[in-house]
């Protein structure tokens, strides 16, 4: 949507260092963003729960029924493990490398733009506490528990708002 393309445009202009998202759909990369931290994983990458082999999304889409790993094991048999998306389900831990990368970017930012989130899902909502830069801009239609931390609050759709910023 417009927000994904606007963020990619800001990155291309050198004004955005990273996108930190809870979305698992891969749309930030599809829009052109390069530095994306997917806190809850992605459906674009999939893996065998038994042997760990990685598979593209097409394997899931083209599968009839539950996708199974067809890799031959050391005995010549087929692995047959279930192939599932690399996503974080409720009560599962987040990837430490993704979280530490996100924290690094938040700590080093002079401005933090938070958009399209109610800031209620933890631990992602708690990442705001790592920001020590100058300005927080919050773009969300409804109030959040972090509104008091924001220097600017915009209660408009995020796509149109970011698109207007990129065009100026």
Report each predicted region and the residues it spans.
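Conserved catalytic alpha/beta core of Sir2/sirtuin-type deacylases, generalized to analogous enzyme cores
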Residues: 1-168
């Amino acid at each position: 949507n417009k927000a994904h393309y606007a963020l990619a445009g800001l990155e291309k202009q050198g004004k955005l260092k990273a996108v930190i998202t809870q979305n698992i759909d891969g749309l930030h990369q599809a829009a052109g963003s390069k530095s994306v931290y997917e806190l809850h994983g992605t459906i674009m990458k999939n893996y065998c729960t038994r042997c760990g082999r990685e598979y593209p999304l097409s394997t899931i889409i083209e599968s009839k029924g539950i996708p199974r790993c067809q890799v031959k094991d050391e005995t010549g048999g087929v692995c047959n493990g279930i192939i599932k998306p690399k996503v974080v389900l409720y009560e599962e831990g987040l990837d430490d490398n993704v979280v530490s990368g996100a924290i690094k970017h938040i700590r080093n930012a002079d401005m933090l733009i938070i958009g399209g989130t109610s800031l209620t899902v933890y631990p992602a909502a708690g990442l705001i506490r790592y920001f020590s830069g100058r300005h927080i801009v919050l773009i969300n239609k409804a109030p959040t528990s972090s509104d008091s931390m924001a220097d600017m609050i915009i209660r408009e759709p995020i796509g149109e708002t970011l698109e207007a910023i990129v065009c100026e």
